Amino acid sequence: MNFGMLKLLTVLIICYSNNFMRTRGGNGK
């Protein structure tokens, strides 16, 4: 696996997780 790909995947996951938490928690953090 490529390091750049891993980094991109991590950023994608973090972004998705953040969006999910915001949608679920309302105002959230």
From Swiss-Prot:
Transmembrane segments: none annotated. Its main location: secreted. GO terms for molecular function: toxin activity. Expressed by the venom secretory cell of the spine. The spine is a cuticular structure containing a single large nucleated venom-secreting cell at its base. It is an independent unit capable of producing, storing and injecting venom. On the back of D.vulnerans caterpillars, spines are grouped together by 50 to 100 to form scoli, of which there are eight in D.vulnerans. Residues 1-15 form the signal peptide. It is found in: Secreted. The modification Asparagine amide is found at N27. One of its GO terms (cellular component) is extracellular region. It comes from the Eukaryota. Keywords: Amidation, Secreted, Signal, Toxin. Belongs to the limacoditoxin-12 family. Probable toxin. Does not show insecticidal, antimicrobial and antiparasitic activities. Does not induce increase in intracellular calcium in mouse DRG neurons, suggesting that it does not induce pain. This is U-limacoditoxin(12)-Dv72. It comes from Doratifera vulnerans.
